[in-house]
Amino acid sequence: MQDTILEYGGQRSKIPKLWEKFSKKRSPYLDRAKHFAKLTLPYLMNNKGDNETSQNGWQGVGAQATNHLANKLAQVLFPAQRSFFRVDLTAKGEKVLDDRGLKKTQLATIFARVETTAMKALEQRQFRPAIVEVFKHLIVAGNCLLYKPSKGAMSAVPMHHYVVNRDTNGDLMDVILLQEKALRTFDPATRMAIEVGMKGKKCKEDDNVKLYTHAQYAGEGFWKINQSADDIPVGKESRIKSEKLPFIPLTWKRSYGEDWGRPLAEDYSGDLFVIQFLSEAMARGAALMADIKYLIRPGSQTDVDHFVNSGTGEVITGVAEDIHIVQLGKYADLTPISAVLEVYTRRIGVIFMMETMTRRDAERVTAVEIQRDALEIEQNMGGVYSLFAMTMQTPIAMWGLQEAGDSFTSELVDPVIVTGIEALGRMAELDKLANFAQYMSLPQTWPEPAQRAIRWGDYMDWVRGQISAELPFLKSEEEMQQEMAQQAQAQQEAMLNEGVAKAVPGVIQQEMKEG
């Protein structure tokens, strides 16, 4: 890494102007993200010092769905108690091994230890809480920046605290992170430069200064990093490789030519709005029905004040017909609203992988139904899994390997993701195996003449073709014939040996008689 010391000589940094330029392109995406946050988790898009309430209106379905899906994705892509990746070598890494006379199979144990060390390093950086928060932002806002400082825990940076710039193909060109730091956190030389840049303005140690960190792509896999306090250059200019970049800008999905991503909530904001609207109607209707009013007949003989102030079980003088309780009778009107609300809630449950919301309402729900529904919901996220394997899991794995040792670079090692889309593929293969077993046992229910008419080899091949199942553990026709031939030969040898064994005593007795 090459460092260049930046000294303040009256020059102003251009980073704040770049921030303003890129912020204009971010504005429409940020406005939409704040709208979606009101339907789900409002606190995600609150600025520091905002007095806005964090209550999400009249419903909690959006918050429940977002929290559930965020935790679900974190558990699937980054499962506890085991590594989400395994270490593999690139072509260059294998060549280095060959030059040293080593074999790849000899390093399996070493790679396992490296994976464990990398996972421990990530755990010490508290990456799991940050990952859950990242998924919440991606679901609601569509964008989030995963930041790894030089020391301490990783953090999920909301989209209103950073800006990005991409080319038409979506490749990242610029990232600017905005942080507010107290003046006393800077070293004395930097603090003096900041005060000089402010034209002698006396600053207190607790005054906050806007610290911009700008990462600019320099080509050939390298990035330049500069910092400025307001518009005053501070620190050093660094040149680092891509895998050492402390930023991972993430998106849920992104259209061609756009710098910013779009969230899952955008696709289903209509459903969330209807849930909000109907929940408000239900709550207001229930409040009206809970409001008790009494009608007093004009000229009644009942003492109204005594009636109002009397306790439970107290004797009151009066006529029952003088006082009447007003009932709105709106319960029947709320019933269809509740039914429609349940339909929309189930639709949100399907998208946000909430199995309990999508399961049919019945006394007996079979295990097959539960497994089928869970698999369908997982498959709906297949595209998201494959995207995050490249944009999130692989860079985080490289971070862990970098923490384990500087020699683990992208030129030599290639982390292979073993969760998410890979695990989903293995689950589908097991499902095919279960279907194969089911169809193979099906002919046993047929009449005996039909069973005798089956060519079992052809039937097995036909079933495998229908369910597109590759079962490498099944023996081929040639292997079956070879085994049958070996068994027949073994039987012949056994019979021959048995015959010889029986004949030997007779031969011996005959020789003894002749002798």
From Swiss-Prot:
One short Pfam name that applies is Head-tail_con
**Secretion signal, residue range per the UniProt entry:** none
The compartments listed are: Virion
Transmembrane spans: none
Q: Does the keyword Protease feature in the UniProt annotation?
A: no
The organism's superkingdom is given as: Viruses
Query: In the UniProt record, which is one GO cellular component term?
Result: viral capsid
Q: How does it assemble?
A: Homododecamer.
Instruction: Please state which protein family the record places this protein in.
Output: Belongs to the podoviridae head-to-tail connector protein family.
What protein am I looking at?
Portal protein
Q: Which gene encodes it?
A: 30
